[in-house]
């Protein structure tokens, strides 16, 4: 049975990580319409929260809004109990929120750049001191994630556009994990 192959892990539910209260988000293409209205939920450490719905139901727009890329009309977002105004991906990452987007080619990586540069993009603060990049530290982190996620490439200098789709997705996941998120959002991650 599937329960035998993949036994349920006992996970301790911890502190509140994210609370969304009465969020209303404008439709991305029809500004006279809202795609989501009055959405509220809470996410705790150790929980997995799934969103489902038909195409156009607002799943992607909700995640993009929490990542600082949506048009939030009303509502509040709390991260670890503190009210936040997340208006950019940089602000989301600073608050421990990352997003693996549905469209990795347009939103997840820069194809002509190397694996190393793509993985490092969202964690420049971790691999630099006084705004000066520390290549030894960058190489350490990138090689660690290439090994952990089994990214198949001759080196970290290979352009991401030259990788298979699965390895491209692993680069995007590595980039997100290197940022040490407390909240990892995935929009159609197996696509």
Could you say what each language-model-derived stretch is?
Residues 1-191:
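Glycine-rich phosphate-binding loops of nucleotide-dependent enzymes
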